[in-house]
Amino acid sequence: MVTPRRDSGSDRPSLKDARILVVEARYYDDIADELLRGATEAIAASGAEAEVVTVPGALEIPQTVAILVEAAMRSGKPYDAVVALGCVIRGETGHYDIVAGESARALMDLSVLLRLPLGNGILTVETEAQAQARARVSEMNKGGGAAEAALAVLALKRANAAEHPGRTIGFTPRRAAETAE
């Protein structure tokens, strides 16, 4: 029987030197305030440093992440993880489906391609009341949850690097010569 491994947090590598990029969409200011508060509190509790950048809406988040992550890598000060925050509330047209789906897909593509831990805190809801409940730190705290997700994957990435120096986390295909042996 396989026993799932639960992360207690106590054996996590230190995240004190981690640089976390937080990109927030402020289309709904009151919701954005709560999402950001939850995320920055979680990041501060981990000892990591947050850099917050604001964009108008959810579709601007992935392109902003791509631009800033690339610039940070070129500068020699790469981000260790990203947290995306925003809110998309269903309206009367199909715009909701495009914004919700495309922003999530683009963020996942970036995360996998760059092997960059990313917490997606873009709420996709039917009503403003649902958004408020999910955003509020005192209720569902989805901003904090997105930050915790990014930090957990970062801790996993660092633990893997410590256990296997010189090897990156993720899939590495075998070369033909290795499989012939």
Curated annotation (Swiss-Prot):
Residues annotated as catalytic: 95
Annotated CDD domains: Lumazine_synthase-I (cd09209)
An example Gene Ontology CC term for this record: riboflavin synthase complex
Record-level Gene Ontology MF annotations: 6,7-dimethyl-8-ribityllumazine synthase activity
Disulfide bonds: none
Binding site for (2S)-2-hydroxy-3-oxobutyl phosphate: 92-93, 134
Coiled-coil region(s): none
EC number(s) recorded for this UniProt protein: 2.5.1.78
Binding site for 5-amino-6-(D-ribitylamino)uracil: 27, 58-60, 87-89, 120
HAMAP family according to UniProt: Lumazine_synth
Official protein name in the record: 6,7-dimethyl-8-ribityllumazine synthase
Organism: Methylobacterium nodulans (strain LMG 21967 / CNCM I-2342 / ORS 2060)
